[in-house]
């Protein structure tokens, strides 16, 4: 079933790149558009511990792990870190707002977090740096 394996690997590639680009955009926004100081201030209003430190860590995880997902390198680690990142966003910001993004709800963070964890579980697929390095 070579054709099915190729289809599976192509689907994993599309999922990795799609999720990775979204995370890169959010990390980039936190670092360079809003700035981590402003993000830290926002985090403080949500009761996030050490909000300025956490803002820097979250921005870094989203940017670096997002790039890792796109490339398919260290994919299980990147997926787990992003899943934890989204769990934090769910807990501190979105859980009580209902499901819809238009109301700052949880649907996007759940979809992103579950997607990242799924990629961590299934691996990067054949079209990845992980596979090229023998992983």
Report the location of each language-model feature.
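Membrane-interface interhelical connector segments
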Residues: 32-50, 54
């Amino acid at each position: 079933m070579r054709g099915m394996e190729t289809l599976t690997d192509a689907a994993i590639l599309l999922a990795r790149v799609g999720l990775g680009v979204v995370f890169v955009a959010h990390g980039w926004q936190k670092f360079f558009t809003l700035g981590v100081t402003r993000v830290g201030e926002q985090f403080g209003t949500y009761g996030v511990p050490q909000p300025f430190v956490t803002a820097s860590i979250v921005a870094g995880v989203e940017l670096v792990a997002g790039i890792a997902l796109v490339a398919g390198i260290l994919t299980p680690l990147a997926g787990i870190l992003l899943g934890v990142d989204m769990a934090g966003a769910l807990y501190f910001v979105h859980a009580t707002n209902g499901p819809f993004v238009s109301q700052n709800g949880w649907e996007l963070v759940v979809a992103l977090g579950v997607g990242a964890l799924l990629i961590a579980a299934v691996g990067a697929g054949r079209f990845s740096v992980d596979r090229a390095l023998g992983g």
